[in-house]
Amino acid sequence: MSQYPLPFHKDSTGHIRPLGLVQPLMGSILPTGDFAVPIVPESQWQEFDLTTEPGYPLVVKDQNGKGACNGHATAEAMELARWIHGQPHVPLSGWFPYAILCGGWDRGSSIGEALALIEKTGLAPETQVPYGTINPTRLSKDAYDVATNFKCEVGIPLESWEQIMSAVQLRMGGVNVSIRVSNGVWTIDDEGIVPVSRGQGNHAICIGHGVKRLKSGGWAIKWQNSWSGQWGDKGYAWYTKDHWETQTLREAWVIRTPMENPRDDSNPPVIS
C-alpha cells in the first residue's frame, strides 16, 4: 500500500501534505436551517486585516502529514469566531474532530460533516488531545466533556461568493471553505495568492481574517492554512472568487454564533 493513500502535494518547504478534503458521495450534506447571510453589496465592501489587530491570538496550526485539513480548518474557524465575538482565546484541537470523522483511518473528511459535528459534539482544547491523534478510541471522556463548552450554536451553509464575502464583511465568524490544490507549484505570488486550478475542492481552509482589493480590481479574503507558519506568508494567503467558482465540487459554512461557555465569566453581556 502506498505510504500516502490520499492525494498529496509536496509544498515549497519540502513537506508532503495529504489533501484530506473529500466530497460526500450523494452531494453536500451541509445542514440547513432558518438562518441566512444578509448580502452586503460590493459597493460597501471594505478592506481590513484582523491579523494586525492588537491582541490577535490565533497561531497557525500544522496537520503534520495527515489528511486532517478539515479538522484543523474547523478548529481555526471556531477560534476565529470566538475571538470576533469577544470570547477568550482557547487553542482548539484540529485532531479531535478529524479523529471522530475519519474513524481512525487517515482518509479525509467533508466540510459538511464537520459542521454537524461541532453543532452536536463541539471541539476539545489542544490541551485535551495529544498532537497527531487520529484514533477516536484515544480521545478521553474529559476531552468529550470539555468539548461541549466549544460548540457551534448557529452555523450557516454558504453557497455563493457573495454569501462568503458578506459573511466575512459582517465579521460573522470563521469560515471553513474548500479550495483546489493544483498538481504543480502551489506557492503564493506577490499578492499572496496561490494558483487557481479547476477540479473538485481537495483542501479545507479557514478564511475570514481580512479582505483586500487586488491590483486587478477584484477582491480577496485572507485565509489561514494548516501547513505551519513556514508556508505562504507566515501561514497565510488570500482567497479569490476564482478559487471558489472554478471548483467543480465545493462546500463552505460560517460559524455565525459560537456557544457561550456557562463556566466562563468573561463572556460578553447579552444585549436585549
Predicted regions and their residues:
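Predominantly the structural core of cysteine protease catalytic domains
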Residues: 2-5, 10, 75-79, 101-272
